[in-house]
Regions:
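Residue-level signal for inorganic ion chemistry
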Residues: 47, 84, 106, 192, ...
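Rossmann-like NAD(P) dinucleotide-binding subdomain of oxidoreductase/dehydrogenase enzymes
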Residues: 140-290
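Terminal low-complexity tails and localization/encapsulation signals of metabolic enzymes
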Residues: 1-53, 86, 90, 138-171, ...
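Short, well-ordered beta-strand elements within core beta-sheets of diverse protein domains
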Residues: 49-56, 73-77, 169-170, 280-283, ...
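Conserved C-terminal structural/oligomerization subdomain of aldehyde/semialdehyde dehydrogenase
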Residues: 48-51, 244, 281, 335, ...
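Structural signal for hydrophobic packing residues in well-ordered secondary-structure cores
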Residues: 72, 76, 92-99, 103, ...
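Glycine-rich loop-to-alpha-helix module at the N-terminal edge of alpha/beta enzyme cores
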Residues: 50-140
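ALDH superfamily catalytic-core signature
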Residues: 254-396, 418-421, 460, 505-507
Length: 507
């Protein structure tokens, strides 16, 4: 019998952290929410309440923005780029030093396996902060030669400066809390912006812990503020606030559209990383063992609660049966259990509502005639667990092939000896365009298919390659803009052009 989360050991520090009713972090202080509302935090592996948070109101968001504005115009503006680098590197080091507590908190309020929690902290959170720390000293403008017809026959100097936009808002999803926090925090700090952050109200624990580390790192008060709360309250207040100059959001397409509407009031910049329904295209010469494990990771990483998930598997007919047999064999043997159990490979879904939503798609797949190869059941035990699920043999118009499920459900279908444009057209039959992958030993085929797939990121012989330096974002209904890499700095910056006239023109 697998151990339960209640019986698995967690550190004394984690237990102490969980025992608190957590306040808001505004202007470097832990303050009570004006709403007086609290929310219990639930462990999705046990359905037990493990901690409690206070919920921010619109007034609390206002206070956070005021603090962020004051810091932006005050002490933070006086800290040079070299000093920002040192502060960010200190924060990254503190995250690594606190990896045990952070990983335990991430497992307990999100449900992912411990191995993945540790990886998202050391392989994503701290690394993203270090990467962008290196950019602090490399953000610069240009000098621009101007035409004689423009100003003073060349007797002038025109230059540009890249300046921080000001206070930025970040709305963090629940599926990868600390990684998403870091990838939004890092470019904001690197560019000299200040922040108001709303974590998902059901997974706020690692963000709350990171605020302690922000303070310990010496980042000035007011630079980073955290307002846990409901999306329709705190999230809406951030999106519409006239003094927030840019919002970064990761989440559903429907909520992203609402954020765009809310941002119209002051025409703030908006970056959106939204839904996905990514294709995985497998050609007959592909390494079948690599494809098998690649498809498993693509579909079931983070229990399928992953915007980049490769949930549409297209396999050439010559190897389709073998690939499906292999994938089903691995999926059906995956160990499902609480993330604190080191043997667990697949944790619970985030909530009862999310599991019900995913199970409704499983039923829709059956009703629309798709063949269920494996899985399709929720587990009869405490926790929001369900089996990894594989469907095949249905047309592309079924719901499970079209709509983002955000759970461990994979739909596979064969393709024949069509030209690459026809195969790509099938892969592109989606309102989304976030990620995708191509599996082949023929590099020419891989590169051609990568160019034809309409997604913001395509990988060849792997799926969803992620690195701080690789720009990431979606096409179509998968979002606006790019995060990561140099492009990830752009939304946090504005360009100011200045011209100095040395002499008056002779006319």
């Amino acid at each position: 019998m697998s151990a339960t989360a209640e019986t698995l050991a967690i550190s004394t520090e984690t237990r102490e952290f969980l025992s608190r009713t957590h306040k808001l972090f505004i202007n470097g202080q832990w303050v009570d929410a004006t709403s007086g509302e609290t929310l219990g935090i639930i462990d999705p592996a046990t359905e037990a309440q493990i901690s409690e948070i206070q919920l921010a109101s619109t007034d609390d968001v206002d206070k956070a923005v005021i603090a962020a504005q004051a810091a932006f115009k005050g002490e933070w503006s006086k800290i040079n780029s070299h000093q920002r680098t040192k502060l960010m590197l200190k924060l990254a080091d503190l995250i690594d030093e606190n990896i045990q507590t952070l990983a335990e908190l991430e497992v307990l309020d999100n449900g992912l396996p411990m191995m993945l929690a540790e990886y998202t902290i050391s392989g994503y959170a701290s690394d993203f902060i270090r990467y962008y720390a290196g950019w602090c000293t490399k953000i610069h403008g240009d000098t621009i030669p101007v035409s004689p017809a423009g100003v003073a026959n060349g007797e002038s100097l025109t230059y540009t400066r890249r300046e921080p936009v000001g206070v930025v808002g970040a709305i963090i999803p629940w599926n990868a809390p600390i990684a998403m926090l870091a990838l939004k925090l890092a470019p904001a700090l690197a560019t000299g912006c200040t922040m108001v952050i709303k974590p998902a109200e059901i997974t706020p624990l690692t963000a709350l812990k990171v605020m302690e580390l922000v303070k310990e790192a010496g980042i000035p008060d007011g630079v980073v503020n955290l307002v846990p709360g409901y999306g329709e309250v705190a999230g809406a207040a951030i999106s519409s606030h006239p003094d927030i100059k840019k919002v970064s959001f990761t989440g559903s397409t429907a909520v992203g559209q609402k954020i765009v509407e809310a941002a119209l009031g002051n025409l703030k910049k908006v970056s959106l990383e939204l839904g996905g329904k990514s294709p995985v295209v497998v050609f007959p010469d592909a390494d079948i063992e690599a494809v098998t494990m690649g498809a498993i990771r693509a579909a079931f990483f983070l229990q399928g609660q992953n915007c980049m998930a490769g949930t549409r598997l297209f396999v050439h007919q010559d190897i389709f049966d073998q690939v499906i047999q292999n994938v089903a064999g691995v999926a059906s043997q995956m160990k499902i259990g609480p993330g604190l159990d080191p043997s667990s490979q697949l944790g619970p879904l985030i909530s009862a509502d999310q599991r019900s939503r995913v199970m409704s798609y499983v039923q829709a797949g059956k009703d629309e005639g798709a063949e269920l190869i494996c899985g399709g059941n929720q587990l009869d035990r405490k926790g929001f667990f369900m089996e990894p699920t594989l469907f095949t043999h249905a047309h592309q118009d079924v719901k499970i092939a079209r709509e983002e499920i955000f759970g461990p459900v994979l739909f596979a279908q064969p393709f024949g000896d069509s030209d690459l444009e026809t195969i790509a057209a099938e892969a592109n039959k989606s309102i989304y365009g976030l990620s995708g992958s191509v599996w082949t030993k023929d590099i020419a085929v891989g590169l051609k298919m990568a160019s034809l797939i309409d997604s913001g990121q395509v990988s060849v012989n792997c799926h969803a390659a992620v690195d701080p330096a690789i720009p990431f974002g979606g096409n179509k209904m998968s979002g606006w803009g790019r995060e990561f890499g140099q492009e990830g700095l752009e939304p946090y910056l504005k360009t100011k052009a200045t011209t100095v006239l040395f002499s008056q023109p002779p006319f």
